[in-house]
Every structure is written in C-alpha cells, then in structure tokens.
UniProtKB/Swiss-Prot annotation:
This is MFS-type transporter lnaF. Glycans are attached at residues 40, 58, 68. InterPro entries: MFS_dom, MFS_sugar_transport-like, MFS_trans_sf. The chain crosses the membrane at residues 105-125, 128-148, 156-176, 203-223, 228-248, 290-310, 323-343, 354-374, 383-403, 446-466. The gene is lnaF. SUPFAM superfamilies: MFS general substrate transporter (SSF103473).
Length: 494
C-alpha cells in the first residue's frame, strides 16, 4: 500500500477537531464536577483517609447514651422538686404560678440552648458543642444543689428559676450535636439498624432515667428518714455527677466521617445562602417542627404534672407512697419505647408515630371520661396513665427525634434538628403553662381530653412527614452539594 502524505495530513486535520472536542468535553466535565462540589466521601479510599478509631466511635455512642440518660434525669427532677417544695413551703409559699415558672425555666433554657448549639455544632464542631453543654449542665445543677441555702423564700425560688435555666441551656444544647453525632456514627456502624440504635440511646435512655431517678429519690427519703432538705441535696448532687462523667468521655471523642467531609465550616454564608436552605427544606422543617410541638405540648406537662396528680389522689398524702406510685408510673413507658424502636424498621417511622398518636387519642378520652371513677382506684389509674405514656413514647416519642435528624443533610443536620426541637420545647412550655390553670378551673380530667384532641392533630401531621428510613444520608449530602453549587454556593471543603 502506497503512503500518501497529503491524505495522511488530511486525515490528521479531520481528526483534530474531534480530538479537540473530546478534550474540551473532558475539561468541562472536570470543571462541572469541581463546581458542583462533589465530595467522594462515599468512596471507600476517600473515607478511609479520615475515619475515627473504633474506640472513638464507641465513646461517641456511649457518651450519647449517658448524656441522654442525664438529660432525662434532669427533666425528671421536676417531679420530686415540686413535692419537696410543696411540703417545705406550703401552698402559700409555693403557689401554682411559681411551680409553673420553675418547670418552664428548664424549658426556656433548653429552647435557647438547642437553637444556639444547633447552629454552632454545624458551623464549628460536634465535639466542642458537646463539651460545652456538659459543662453547663454540671454548673447549673451544682448551683441548684445550693438553692435551700438562699433566703428568704421568695429569693430562693427566683434563684432556683435562674440556675435551672442555666442547666436547661446545657440540656437543650445537648440535643442537636448529640443527635447529629449519634445518627452519623450509627450510620457508619450499621446503616440498617441506625433507627433502632438511635432510639435506644435517645428516647430509651431519657425514658429509663425517670423511674431510676424516682428510685434514687425514694432511697434518699428512706436513708434520711424523710428529711426533705437532705433528700433535695442528695438527688441534685447525684444529678451533678453524670455530666462530669460525660465531659471526661467527650475529651477522647472526635467528629464523625460524614461531618468531616460535609460541613459548612469554610462556607461563605450570606443571607441568600440561608434562604436557599430554607427554600429546599422548608416542608420537612415545617412538618417536623409542628409534629414536635404537638407531641411535647401534651407529653411534657403530663409527665411533670404526674406527681401532683398522684399526690392529690393518695389519701394520706404520704410522700413515700407518692414516690412508689411515681416509680411504677415512670417504669411503664419503657417497654413502649422498646416496641417503638423495633417498629421503626418493621413498619417505618411514619406509621409508628401515627400508631402511637392513635393510642394516645383513645386512652386520653378514656381516662378523661372515667376520671371520677379512676381517682378512687389508684392501681387502675396508674396502669391506664402509664399505658397512655407508653403509647406516646412508642409512637412520636421514639420517632420524631429520629425523623428530624435523618431528614436533613449532614452539613445542616444540627440546625434542622435544633429548629424542630425548639418548637417541641416551646410546645412543652406552652403546655405546662396551660395545664396547671386548666386543671384548677376545669378539673384534672380536662387535661386528658385536651391530650386526646391534640393527638388527632398529631396523626394528621405525621402523615405528611418523610419516611426517613428510606433516605440515604450520603446521597442527601451530595444532593445538597449539587443544589448549592447550581445556585452559586459551591461547598468549600476542609
């Protein structure tokens, strides 16, 4: 075959535009991928370049277990505190409005804490936020221990409101970084079981803390021969030890792999940036916040007012008898949480919540309608009241925090969860403010009717929540990265 230089040059010239076009397309693809901010955090080689050790991951999960137990212990302190102050100060010295104010001080502090730490844990570090909140809980609880040394009574009660608010800021601030870190480590550990695992170290721990705290309270009463000031100092001293232990554990933990590769630490964040996030996640934010508000509106007041209701039903108003019934009542919701943890995978997060609200509705109306008879039969009342709480903890109690955590990408998980939780704590504060005067004006049964009615609304809202068990956390992170890049905010990598 004869070689023709001119033909060869012609073919080369013909191929040149094709090759140039291919090079151009490859360059454009590279630029596009860079611009869209793809992070190959799902790639094993990339993920292995930063991965917490097994010990660090285990410490994160263990500290979440203890922290949520501690937070449940803190919330449950309202029950014995109300009884002790009522006995020591009398009705005139401890009026219902001050009782409500003290209960709300922890809640108001929690609302501020959850919003502040939700933002900072996303923008800076989960670990730093968790250390800070543990310190605040320890300081606020230690100061609460000294409350009875403050005189006169009026000053003591206001001092107690303030220091419980400080502890509340720490308790509330604990929720966003703890929930975010916990779900991320659970996803790394065993993705299939992240839901049940999350419920076990959040709702189960907080719920288990209530009966254990009442057992500690009862032991202190017996050991001190019903010396209420000594009992008060003892239960608050024990509550101080827990956050100190958590602080020590958290010195050795680190941030998760997901958070390391997807965060806003170096991101430019003008107002438009936050509006874009709101635009993309507004429906999830609205539905999770509303569901949280409705559940906490009925659950929290019912939980902290239970000691007052039981104390009024105990004929001789014996403080130990009241405490024993409180232990039984506090233990009944625990099996509900365990069932709820199993149901999150078996039937899904949404249907578990709807089922729990349905049970809450039925029992709320049953207890309200039969309250005059139940008030004369303490065992029957406690069983039905405990079953009401068990169904609430099985459904929305087990799932609303889980859905709120899974519904948002890693980079804004703390903020999304914190806003939903803040609405929940607002609902708890509003409910607490409403329940006491409602009981005084319309009778104790009225609160159960209200709880049943709110549960109907909760079922409706739950229908519109995302089924978060179907969400892949890494895909959610990539989708957010693409969305921000397309709108002029490529994610800056660490």
């Amino acid at each position: 075959m004869t070689y023709d230089p001119e033909n060869a040059m012609g073919e080369a010239r013909a191929d040149a535009p094709v090759e140039a076009e291919k090079e151009h397309e490859a360059t454009q693809t590279t630029v596009k991928e860079s611009t869209l901010g793809y992070d190959n955090s799902s790639d094993p080689s990339r993920r292995d370049s930063y991965r917490p050790t097994k010990l660090q991951s285990n410490l994160t999960i263990v500290s979440c277990y203890i922290a949520n137990f501690s937070d449940g212990f803190q919330n449950s302190l309202a029950n014995p505190t109300n009884v002790i102050f009522k006995k020591l100060l009398g009705t005139d010295g401890y009026p219902s409005e001050m009782q409500t104010r003290i209960s709300n001080s922890l809640l108001i502090g929690a609302i501020l804490g959850v919003l502040a730490l939700g933002y900072t844990s996303d923008m800076f570090s989960r670990r730093a936020g968790l250390l800070f909140t543990s310190g605040l809980v320890a300081i606020g609880t230690l100061m609460s221990t000294l409350a009875l040394q403050v005189h006169p009574t009026y000053n003591m009660l206001w001092y107690f409101v303030i220091v419980r608010g400080i502890a509340g800021f720490g308790v509330g601030g604990e929720y966003p970084p703890s929930a975010a870190a916990g779900i991320e480590e659970s996803d790394d550990f065993k993705r299939k079981y992240r839901g049940p695992l999350f419920v076990s170290f959040t709702t189960l721990m907080a719920t288990s803390a209530a009966p254990i705290q009442m057992i500690v309270y009862l032991i202190c009463l017996i050991a001190s021969n019903d010396n209420l000031p000594v009992t008060f100092h003892a239960i608050y001293s024990i509550a101080t030890i827990l956050p100190v232990i958590i602080m020590v554990l958290r010195f050795f933990m680190t941030d998760s792999t997901l958070f390391h590769y997807s965060n806003f630490k170096r991101q430019k964040r003008p107002l438009k940036f936050y509006l874009l996030l709101l635009k993309r996640y507004r429906w999830r934010l609205f539905t999770t916040s509303l569901a949280f508000f409705l559940y906490d509106f009925i659950n929290f007041p019912n939980s902290i007012m239970s000691s007052t209701i039981i104390n009024s039903l105990v004929k001789d108003h014996n403080i130990r008898t009241t405490a024993i019934w409180q232990v039984i009542l506090g233990a009944l919701p625990v099996p509900g949480v365990i069932v709820g943890a199993w149901l999150t995978n078996a039937i899904g997060r949404r249907y578990t919540g709807i089922l729990g609200f349905a049970g809450y509705m039925v029992l709320g109306f049953v207890i309200g309608g039969t309250f005059p008879h139940l008030s004369k039969n303490m065992p029957a009342f406690v069983v039905l009241y405990g079953l009401l709480q068990a169904l609430g903890h099985m459904g929305p109690g087990a799932t609303i925090g889980l859905i709120s955590t899974e519904s948002f990408p890693t980079a804004m998980r703390g903020m999304g969860y914190s806003i939903a939780t803040a609405f929940g704590r607002t609902g708890a504060a509003v409910g607490t403010q409403c329940f006491t005067p409602l009981q005084e004006r319309a009778g104790k049964q009225s609160t159960f009717y209200l709880a049943g009615g709110i549960a109907i609304l909760g079922m409706i809202v739950y229908w519109f929540l995302p089924e978060s068990s179907e969400l892949n956390l890494e895909e959610e992170d990539r989708d957010l990265s693409v969305f921000l890049a397309e709108n002029g905010f490529p994610m800056e990598k660490a």
